[in-house]
Amino acid sequence: PYRMLPAKEYFTLKTGNDKFHSERGMPNVMTYESMLRTFSPEGIWPQDNEWGMHDYTREGAQGCTSFNEIIAKGYGEPQSAKEFAELAQWVNYDGHRSLFESRSQNRKGLLMWMSHSCWPSMVWQTYDYYFEPTAAYFAIKKASEPLHIQWNPATDEVEVVNYSAGTHKGLTAKVQVLNMDASVAWEKEATVDSNEDTTD
């Protein structure tokens, strides 16, 4: 899919996770600073045809309606372009990280559609037209670590993914769930082993 899906759905896709996938993507909103450079003062908010000119269309491959719904469900309706752009970075990070983390079981590979756009766009990029990295860049980098810990929302389990970091014994894994104000809501620590080329 090229539209945004809830994180769990990337882990439970009926087709695609069992093979190399040559392109996947989702809306990927640029930073607010880049939006100020892109949109006219009249067109920056609310979302309108000017957004569509920069690929943020509610229908078609981009499917930005689902992106808006995920923001509203998780954080409430944004009241400004600045608030939308800030919330979108959280959603983009979660979505892109889940997209890559969901591939860890079968290890079949994934190419991102795409790294950058040829003009100011709100979709399918890891850095924007102005070379500003988006949340996607950092999420993909994190999800692709040679030795990585992740939460699998389909099984509600924490997994240690070891792509190529060698075998490690006696690692300490610490999990924290944070509130929106960054206070710790829950945490747990465990000692784990990780064999090379495994997801446990």
Give the label of every model feature segment.
Residues R3-K169:
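Substrate-binding clefts and catalytic carboxylate motifs of secreted carbohydrate-active enzymes
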Residues D156-D200:
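Beta-strand-rich binding/interaction modules
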